Design a protein with these regions (language model features):
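Bergerat-fold GHKL/Histidine-kinase-like ATPase
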Residues: 1-222
Length: 222
């Protein structure tokens, strides 16, 4: 049976091995320590054989060879709605996440443009769902729109709101790389160059999945 450590002295001994400082009495959070790893084995298989991505694009994905970069990417991919998102507290009882990887912070200034967009979409939809008197308006992506999701099973025939945007590579911003969004999200085997990507998230601001869903997206967005 695996049980958590609860002895502060024992925990401190482990933290000292890795020169990691413990949280102060007023701090809460999660620290991920990955010791004694085989880097090559851990990063193996990020891009499987016959994934449909060109060798040139794979070569641009430097995160495939660097664990710190890969963790930064993974955090943004799954927690983008809350990473340094100070606007989220205006529309829900959620706190923004202050994330550091090897001591380096992830902020809105250095997030990858794709996940900065994901964050703005989430905040826009959250604002619409809360019926905010002053709905959130993205400065970075002003073309984001919100639509209601119809449902005959709920009062008001509405299940909430979804935020969406049609965007070009140039509109993603100067920091946008030549790496395809499908590559970042590991959506291999897409049928066209502009299949709509649907993001599913849960209340605390954690993303559950990204999927290519052409029929649902086109049915919702007229």
């Amino acid at each position: 049976e695996i049980l958590p450590l609860t002895s502060e002295a024992e925990i401190q001994t482990i933290l000292d091995i890795f020169s990691v400082k413990k949280f102060s009495p007023t701090q809460t959070g999660t620290a991920i320590i990955i010791p004694y790893i085989n880097k090559a084995r851990l990063l193996h298989g990020i891009f499987p054989d016959n994934c449909g991505i060109t060798a040139e694009e794979i070569a641009m994905c430097t995160f495939k060879d660097d664990i710190a970069q890969y963790i930064e990417l993974a955090v943004q991919k799954w927690y983008a709605p809350r990473v340094y998102n100070k606007a989220v507290k205006e529309y829900a009882a959620q706190k923004w996440l202050a994330v550091r990887v090897n001591g380096n912070p992830i902020t809105d200034a250095n997030m990858r443009p794709l996940f900065r967009l994901v964050q703005e979409l989430y905040t826009s939809a959250l604002s619409a769902n809360q019926g905010a008197t002053q709905p959130y308006k993205s400065k970075a992506f002003p073309f984001i729109k919100c639509v209601s999701i119809p449902s005959q099973k709920l009062t008001g025939n509405k299940a909430g709101h979804a935020a969406y945007i049609r965007i070009t590579k140039d509109e993603m911003g100067a920091g946008s790389s030549s790496i395809n969004p499908y590559t970042y999200l590991r959506l291999f085997g897409k049928t066209s160059l502009n299949d709509p990507i649907v993001m599913f998230a849960r209340t605390p601001g954690m993303i559950l999945d990204y999927k290519i869903d052409d029929k649902w997206a086109k049915g919702l967005i007229k």
